[in-house]
Regions:
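Extended, low-polarity segments enriched in aliphatic/aromatic residues
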Residues: 1-257
Length: 257
């Protein structure tokens, strides 16, 4: 929710991004990431955590366009409300973290300038009455660009990553409710290479079978890509782009301890 930040060069898509001042100033960092699914990223791990967790939601002067909104949206990214589908359940109004959504005389309104385009309202709408335009490939590459921007504020070998492959949910932890984990706990990974640890985590997830009564249970033996089948998002792009940007290597060696 803060706007105490410093603009840092990112990449071709993002340009510059508002990195949180405290992260910018500290000499080292331990990145603890709970592995789970994600409405936009498909897979949410260390890259998503650094990219979204290391920047501000908005900037004092350019608002959401210099913060998380720069990743969440393409163009202006205006919310679209379909009145015919809307049943006035008000779930979108209740979940909005900034309380920008209101219904007046049964008509949807929101303070566009204050909205940071997180997409939670669209996600919880049971009828699909709210949509937020986006571009999957752009979003994945923007995640990698922003992660690089955040990590560029540290000297080499000053960041370590811990991925928790436990209680693996189909949704982001920012959602208001938890579900049955989609697979059994797989363990905890630690590395100083953000790309390697992400690739290792994904490989472990793809080898696991869906748990009964979870969002993935209907996939059963039919799936060999549980992450994609749950989200329909090309999640590997973020890993590939992070590697292309020089953040690490997809090659790794697993050492059990």
């Amino acid at each position: 929710y803060g706007n105490d930040n410093i603009m840092v060069k990112a990449g071709e898509i993002i340009g510059e991004i508002a990195v949180a001042s405290l992260i910018y100033d500290v000499p080292a960092m331990v990145v603890c990431s709970h592995i789970k699914g994600h409405i936009q990223a498909g897979y949410a791990g260390a890259i998503k955590n650094v990219a979204m967790g290391g920047i501000s939601s908005s900037h004092r002067h350019c608002g959401w366009k210099c913060g998380r909104g720069a990743m969440h949206t393409i163009g202006e990214g205006k919310l679209i409300w379909d009145e015919e589908k809307c049943e006035l359940c008000l779930q979108c109004e209740e979940i909005c973290p900034l309380e920008v959504i209101k219904f007046e005389n049964e008509q949807f309104t929101y303070r566009e300038a204050d909205c940071w385009r997180c997409g939670r309202c669209a996600r919880v709408c049971p009828e699909g009455a709210l949509t937020l335009p986006g571009d999957d490939e752009r979003f994945m590459k923007a995640l990698a660009e922003t992660a690089k921007a955040v990590l560029s504020t540290f000297k080499p070998n000053k960041v370590i990553y811990i991925n928790f492959l436990t209680e693996i949910q189909p949704e982001c932890d920012c959602m208001p409710a938890a579900d049955v984990p989609v697979i059994q706990d797989q363990g905890i990974l630690i590395s100083d290479d953000i790309v390697a640890i992400e690739q290792a985590a994904i490989d472990m997830l793809l080898k696991a079978k869906p748990l009964p009564q979870s969002a993935a249970s209907e996939l059963g033996e039919k799936t060999d890509n549980i992450l994609y089948d749950l989200s329909k998002k090309p999640y590997l792009i973020q890993i590939e782009e992070a590697g292309r940007l020089g953040l690490g290597s997809r090659q790794y060696e697993l050492i059990e301890i």
